[in-house]
């Protein structure tokens, strides 16, 4: 039976029967297009990024099986992880993007309506285990279809020079005056320690885990370990 899970709660728990599951679609790549006088067609610039995607489920609501209307609406409010039974081993970051027909739900014991989610472009592995690095030259392999934006926590002290090498090149990062630990979050493009903003302590680009092998090395201050949350992702 088809289902979806949003914010850790299954559609089955909410009294929803899925008549039509969401389609599997690839996000559109973003381009800028220019018309140039005297030139055929368009001049296209690839921005290297992707648009959001839409995942729509056509559902039947069985009022008797619904915990409560307030609980249903609270569940569908805000952003969270979305898992479809079609691809049950990965999730999207999503939020509901259409109005829920409250009047019809209240008046009818059984009602059919769509639930449409706007999703960030990529899907991510449900299993996103932290990888611990304690030795120079340790390699993390990205076997997914997209370069990933990891979150790294470096444990150590002093000024640390961190390098991450792949077939695409080297990320060179300097972390100044580290005391105990510092976190580099590529997804949010922030460097911090707890609630403390540490962007001024970091020089270099936020690292990407490229497809294939990524090798970690460091010099300078002392490093006891690096914890890597890889955030491996896919195009669908």
Task: Outline where the language-model segments fall.
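Solvent-exposed edge beta-strands and adjacent loop segments
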Residues: 1-52, 89-103
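Oligomerization/assembly interface segments of phage tail-like spikes and tubes
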Residues: 34-64, 109-122, 214
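Mixed-charge, glycine-accented linear interaction segment located at domain edges/termini
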Residues: 5-9, 118-120, 208
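Short, acidic/charged, Gly/Pro-enriched secondary-structure junctions
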Residues: 58-99, 215
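Solvent-exposed loop and beta-edge segments used for protein-protein assembly and interaction
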Residues: 49-53, 76, 107-111, 144-146, ...
């Amino acid at each position: 039976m088809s289902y979806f899970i949003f914010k850790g709660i299954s559609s089955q728990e909410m009294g929803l029967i899925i008549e039509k599951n969401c389609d599997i679609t690839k996000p559109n790549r973003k381009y800028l297009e220019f018309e140039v006088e005297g030139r055929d067609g368009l001049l296209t610039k690839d921005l290297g990024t992707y648009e959001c995607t839409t995942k729509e489920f056509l559902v039947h609501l069985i009022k008797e099986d619904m915990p409560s209307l307030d609980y249903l609406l609270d569940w569908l409010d805000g952003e969270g992880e979305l898992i479809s039974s079609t691809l049950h081993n990965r999730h999207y970051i999503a939020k509901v993007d259409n109005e829920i027909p409250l009047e019809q739900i209240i008046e009818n014991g059984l009602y059919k309506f769509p639930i449409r989610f706007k999703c960030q472009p990529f899907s991510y592995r449900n299993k996103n285990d932290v990888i611990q690095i304690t030795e120079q030259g340790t390699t993390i392999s990205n076997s997914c279809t997209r370069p990933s934006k990891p979150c790294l926590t470096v444990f150590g002290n002093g000024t640390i020079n961190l390098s991450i090498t792949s077939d695409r090149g080297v990320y060179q990062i300097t972390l100044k005056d580290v005391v105990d630990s510092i976190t580099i979050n590529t997804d949010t493009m922030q460097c911090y320690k707890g609630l403390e903003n540490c962007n001024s302590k970091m020089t270099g680009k936020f690292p990407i885990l490229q497809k294939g092998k990524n090798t970690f090395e460091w010099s300078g201050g002392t490093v006891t370990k690096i914890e890597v949350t890889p955030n491996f992702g896919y195009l669908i």
